[in-house]
């Protein structure tokens, strides 16, 4: 699922028939209507049944064959061995929930987090500090304990950056939400970014959804934010939609659904060139099998690497949560499959890419299995 604000149930260390059409001849009365011929068993044959069945079969095959072909291709994409050296570069990141800045977390929780992150490659924390209002503003009351968290992380985890994760729902598929077409709204988002940087954050992590491919207003907003963060010596990072697994698939999907889902590879590259870090949300893929999910992640990794400049830090999202629904099958979207897919994509496209990492989503839903698969597959393969 593409998420603008994490759900955050965290605990702390302390806690009728139609009329005949005009001109239609009525059927003969008195039993003179023709009847269907009888079969050998005495039952009446219906001449329309067999063509209908054939049509249904053809339609089913038209739907099934492409799905089987796509699934097979993804499963093949999951085959092979990752290249040596395709593991953490100590440039990973992690999304954290709102409890870290609203007062629910305490010093003991930071200590526990430090122990958890010890000897991992996680160097950036995207801490949910919003959401933004639809007009682009951000109430300071949304992050009352930000300064405490930033100081505590810098003390317990030297070298780890704390970025303000700011998101909102866009009015791209419904009447409510933020409208980036309004210059005043974009300007307010920039002011909100300045606000959190003044509060001590090391960067701004933007997640606006659903964001359609080719949105020029979004690119304009990123240009303005980049000017700000450069002047403040801070990081600008974004959460990015998945890339078309087939050319122009987002356009085809947009014809049949309100939610096109993917970005074009070209648009992904345009976004990547405007930020310091881009995190592709490579989860909620609707893949039904672990092998097809891993193959999909391998493909997404390659597509992203092809258009992300080497000066931009690319991260691939890992599903540190378990759900079972049509968009995310927990038995298929495992951390192990995601990590192996990332390593395969990296191996095939740019095995020596330095500014590259993975990003677990999200801390409060993570299980021990998630952490083990991350460590075994990526940190210590």
Model-derived features with residue positions:
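Extracellular glycoside hydrolase catalytic/binding regions
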Residues: 211-215, 234-304, 327-347
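Conserved, mostly hydrophobic/aromatic
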Residues: 125, 206, 278, 316, ...
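Chitinase-like catalytic core of GlcNAc-active glycosidases
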Residues: 84-111, 116-120, 124, 128-274
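N-terminal Lys/Arg-rich, disordered targeting/topogenic segments
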Residues: 1-53
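Substrate-binding cleft of secreted/luminal carbohydrate-active enzymes
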Residues: 69-73, 283, 306-381
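Hydrophobic membrane-insertion alpha-helices, especially the h-region
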Residues: 54-73
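N-terminal carbohydrate-binding accessory modules
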Residues: 48-52, 70-94, 105
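Flexible loop residues that form catalytic
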Residues: 130, 209, 283-284, 363
């Amino acid at each position: 699922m593409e998420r603008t604000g994490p759900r955050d149930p965290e605990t702390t260390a302390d806690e009728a028939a139609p009329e005949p059409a005009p001109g239609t001849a009525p059927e003969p009365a008195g039993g003179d209507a023709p009847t269907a011929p009888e079969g050998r068993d005495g039952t009446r044959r219906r001449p329309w049944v067999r063509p209908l069945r054939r049509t249904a079969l053809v339609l089913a095959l038209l739907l099934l064959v492409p799905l089987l072909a796509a699934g097979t291709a993804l499963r093949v994409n999951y085959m092979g061995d990752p290249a040596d050296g395709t593991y953490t570069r100590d440039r990973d990141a992690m999304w954290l929930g709102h409890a870290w800045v609203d007062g629910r977390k305490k010093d003991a929780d930071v200590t526990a987090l430090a122990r958890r992150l010890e000897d991992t490659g996680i160097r950036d924390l995207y801490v949910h500090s919003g959401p933004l209002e639809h007009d682009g503003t951000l109430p300071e009351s949304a992050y009352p304990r930000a300064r405490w968290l930033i100081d505590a992380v810098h003390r317990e985890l030297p070298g780890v950056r704390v970025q303000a994760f700011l998101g909102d729902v866009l009015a791209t598929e419904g009447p409510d939400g933020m409208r980036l077409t309004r210059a005043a709204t974009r300007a307010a988002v920039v002011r909100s970014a300045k606000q959190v940087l003044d509060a001590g954050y090391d960067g701004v992590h933007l997640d606006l959804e659903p964001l359609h491919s080719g949105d020029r207003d979004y690119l304009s907003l990123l240009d303005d934010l980049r000017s700000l963060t450069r002047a403040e010596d801070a990081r600008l990072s974004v959460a990015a939609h998945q890339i078309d697994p087939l050319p122009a698939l987002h356009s085809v999907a947009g014809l049949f659904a309100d939610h096109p889902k993917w970005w074009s590879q070209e648009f992904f590259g345009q976004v990547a060139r405007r930020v310091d870090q881009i995190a592709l949300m490579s989860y909620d893929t609707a893949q039904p099998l672990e092998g097809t999910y891993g193959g999909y992640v391998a493909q997404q990794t390659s597509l992203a690497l092809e258009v992300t400049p080497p000066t931009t830090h690319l991260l691939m999202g890992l599903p540190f949560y378990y759900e079972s629904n049509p968009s995310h099958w927990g038995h298929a979207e495992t951390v192990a499959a995601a990590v192996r897919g990332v390593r395969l994509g990296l191996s095939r496209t740019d095995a020596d890419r330095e500014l590259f990492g993975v990003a677990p989503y999200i801390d409060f839903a993570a299980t021990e299995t998630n952490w083990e698969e991350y460590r075994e597959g990526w940190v210590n393969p």
